[in-house]
């Protein structure tokens, strides 16, 4: 087993609850950084516009695209692991880690800002 495979199997992801977004966010960000996946969550990665463009990619570009997809799917999987069933349903249609993360930020960052203002 490679070192990266070993590292990913040891990651313990805490589950987001309705009241724990701020601490969950910090922990998930750290986990995603440690797996070199944070840039996929924040920036995404370049995707072909359609299938014909993808078919025209060079071998090197095709390999890079597949590596990017694999890493983005790994990031999405880690995010999904950190959600209970009801919260998971909010991001179930997300096709990228960036999309899932943005949905969660929209749902929960606003809630934590409102709580801060109320205090």
Write out the residue ranges for each language-model feature.
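N-terminal Lys/Arg-enriched interaction segments
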Residues: 1-119
